[in-house]
Amino acid sequence: MMRIALFLLTNLAVMVVFGLVLSLTGIQSSSVQGLMIMALLFGFGGSFVSLLMSKWMALRSVGGEVIEQPRNERERWLVNTVATQACQAGIAMPQVAIYHAPDINAFATGARRDASLVAVSTGLLQNMSPDEAEAVIAHEISHIANGDMVTMTLIQGVVNTFVIFISRILAQLAAGFMGGNRDEGEESNGNPLIYFAVATVLELVFGILASIITMWFSRHREFHADAGSAKLVGREKMIAALQRLKTSYEPQEATSMMAFCINGKSKSLSELFMTHPPLDKRIEALRTGEYLK
């Protein structure tokens, strides 16, 4: 299943827009309780907007096409495989889509376990054996069965809430200190332009730091999805699929999609900001059975 970074762009846009609304409406003058309520509404708002739009955004991002009726043997195999594994995992049949990309990749998304989407790249269908492709699909089905999208939404909502709240409290203090005189006994928030500028910068900075939390969860859920695939189709098939990914093209999907894909980009400033664990760690975890217990 795909999931973090697609949220990040939408969350960022929603938070900036809501932040502007807060500034224009003077919400920074309200009580701490009022600000917390607004932060909760707006913080979770971005996450739930992302969740509800996730299938549409994902398909649009990669140019995916939902298979309404299989047109050839390859599409028929794909639909049948997804249907079989969905039944094994106890979820409703997801929509199935294909998108054109040379790299070996797949993702799953959707607002609910029973209203989900599984999409695979043409590169996966062309370059993986049936057993390897089956394991990748099982990995995505496991993401859906585990409810990773909803869990990610809740985590992102909490993170957004604290980012908004703390940023605006500090911005209010900074604006009051830098922006102006106030008469004794009269509440003042200083220069509103300073307030908005400081709040926006702090939201961006804290948002980047908070992404460490969401990225950790993204990596953690990959191990569990690998284990779920091993339970559905066998450990050796999943190991073989991951080994195949090591020799594949660097993923071409947009950065905002990486958390949803089975194959994440390997180049990163730090593992803290990676959506996926290194492939060698995932293979080792399967071999030791660490997440299969």
Curated annotation (Swiss-Prot):
The subcellular location is:
Cell inner membrane
Any one biological process term the GO annotation gives: proteolysis
Query: Which keywords accompany this UniProt record?
Result: Cell inner membrane, Cell membrane, Hydrolase, Membrane, Metal-binding, Metalloprotease, Protease, Transmembrane, Transmembrane helix, Zinc
Disulfide-linked positions: none
What does the record's cofactor remark say about binding?
Answer: Binds 1 zinc ion per subunit.
Protein name, UniProt field = Protease HtpX
**Transmembrane spans:** 4-24, 34-54, 158-178, 193-213
Q: Which residues are catalytic?
A: 140
Q: Which GO terms describe its cellular component?
A: plasma membrane
